[in-house]
Amino acid sequence: MKILIVQTNIPGQDVAVKIAEIIVEKRLAACANVLSEATSIYWWEKKLQREIEHPVVFKTTESLKDSLIKELRALHPHDVPEIVFPKLEDVEETYANLIIQETKA
């Protein structure tokens, strides 16, 4: 089974932690890391925006990708949330098995 990393940025630490908890509680990800704040600079509606956000990294399986995306879109405060999948070359077998086990309901 293929293991995926899913990354997003969420404004506000409390919001980021709550979203991460919901996704892990629903077993759409085996774990989530809410990282220290980052300043995001981007264009939105023809205006340059600057916002403090918290990067969040989820570890999941390919079979849960669509469900995780759907849940993240529903919970995320942005209309068009960043949801990216950094490419993994390989995952250590014991850790991969843990992710697979912990994403089973």
Can you describe what each PLM-predicted range is?
Residues 1-105:
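Positively charged, small/polar-rich N-terminal and surface patches that mediate targeting and assembly
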